[in-house]
């Protein structure tokens, strides 16, 4: 019975590790999708501001 419980605990730990790993991967992919748009907007704004300053 003790070995069954140890095996069960080990399996639960493995499932938790895999679940946390998948959650981390998902968070990274969502962040990668979200932030480039903000960065592109910032880059466009910087280009606009710098070109406006150069024209003055």
From Swiss-Prot:
Keywords on this record? Toxin-antitoxin system
UniProt-listed InterPro entries: Arc_rbn_hlx_hlx, MazE
- Determine if Ribosomal protein is one of this entry's keywords: no
Q: Give the top-rank taxon of the lineage listed in the UniProt record for this protein.
A: Bacteria
Signal peptide span: none
Disulphides:
none
Which chain positions lie within coiled-coil regions? none
| Biological processes per GO annotation | regulation of DNA-templated transcription
On subunit structure and binding partners, the annotation says:
Forms a complex with cognate toxin MazF which inhibits the endoribonuclease activity of MazF.
Briefly state the protein's biological role. Answer: Antitoxin component of a type II toxin-antitoxin (TA) system. Labile antitoxin that binds to cognate MazF toxin and counteracts its endoribonuclease activity.
Family listed: Belongs to the MazE/EndoAI family.
| Protein's UniProt name | Antitoxin MazE
């Amino acid at each position: 019975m003790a070995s069954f419980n140890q095996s069960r605990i080990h399996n639960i730990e493995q499932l938790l590790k895999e679940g946390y790993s998948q959650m981390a991967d998902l968070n990274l992919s969502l962040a990668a999708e979200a932030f480039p748009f903000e960065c592109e907007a910032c880059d466009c704004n910087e280009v606009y501001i710098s070109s406006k300053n150069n024209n003055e």
